UniProtKB/Swiss-Prot annotation:
Thylakoid as UniProt keyword: yes
Gene3D superfamilies cross-referenced by the UniProt entry: Single helix bin
Segments crossing the lipid bilayer: 7-27
Record's subcellular location: Plastid, Chloroplast thylakoid membrane
Family: Belongs to the PsaJ family.
InterPro entries, per database record: PSI_PsaJ (IPR002615), PSI_PsaJ_sf (IPR036062)
Protein name: Photosystem I reaction center subunit IX
Upper taxonomic lineage: Eukaryota, Viridiplantae, Chlorophyta, Nephroselmidophyceae, Nephroselmidales
Length: 42
């Protein structure tokens, strides 16, 4: 179990989890606020 927790704390695994979380967050923000980068409300 110690080797498994060491594996989970390595940089590629943490990066994959972080980027997956960030991608999901951006997808959900874009779902609720579509075209937020176009500034069509100005």
């Amino acid at each position: 179990m110690k080797d498994f927790t060491t594996y989970l704390s390595t940089a590629p695994v943490l990066a994959a989890v972080w980027f997956g979380f960030l991608a999901g967050l951006l997808i959900e923000i874009n779902r609720f606020f579509p075209d937020a980068l176009s500034f069509s409300f100005v």
